[in-house]
Amino acid sequence: MSTAVKAGIAALVLLAVAGLTMLFMHFWMAPPDDLDLSREKPSANQLYTVAVAPEQEPFDRNTLHAWIATVKAADGSPVDDAKISVDGGMPQHGHGLPTAPAVTEALGEGRYRIEGVRFNMSGWWELKLHVSAAAAQPEPLKDRG
C-alpha cells in the first residue's frame, strides 16, 4: 500500500472520529442541571458585576445583532474605563462563537455596545466577557520602612 493511500485512509479515519465526537456531543451531552441562565453575574474575581442584554429583543437566530454590557464596580458604581474582550461558544457542541464580536462603543454609565454577535443555531450559548479597568486594579504595596 502506498504512502498516499495510507495518508488518505488515516485522514478518513480522523474525519470519522471527529464526526462521531461532534455527533455524541450534540445529542448526548446535556446541559448541567444547575445551569444559570441569568444575564447578570459577578466577575470571577468579584471586582465587577456584569449584565448583558440584546440591544433589540427579540433577535433572530443566525443574524448579526448587538448586545449591551453594563459593568459596575463592587460598590455598584459604573465602570466607564473598562477594556472588554468577548469570547464564548457552545459548550454542548464544543465550539466557539461563529463570529468575532467586539466592543465597538462605550455608551457611558458603564455601558458598552458589543457588535458582531451571531448565534447560528439553537441551544446553550455562552458569552464570556473579560473585563479590566484601572479603577479596580489592586493598589501597589507601599514600603513601610
Explain the meaning of each model-derived region.
Residues 2-14, 18-126, 130-145:
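Contiguous segments within soluble domain cores/interaction surfaces
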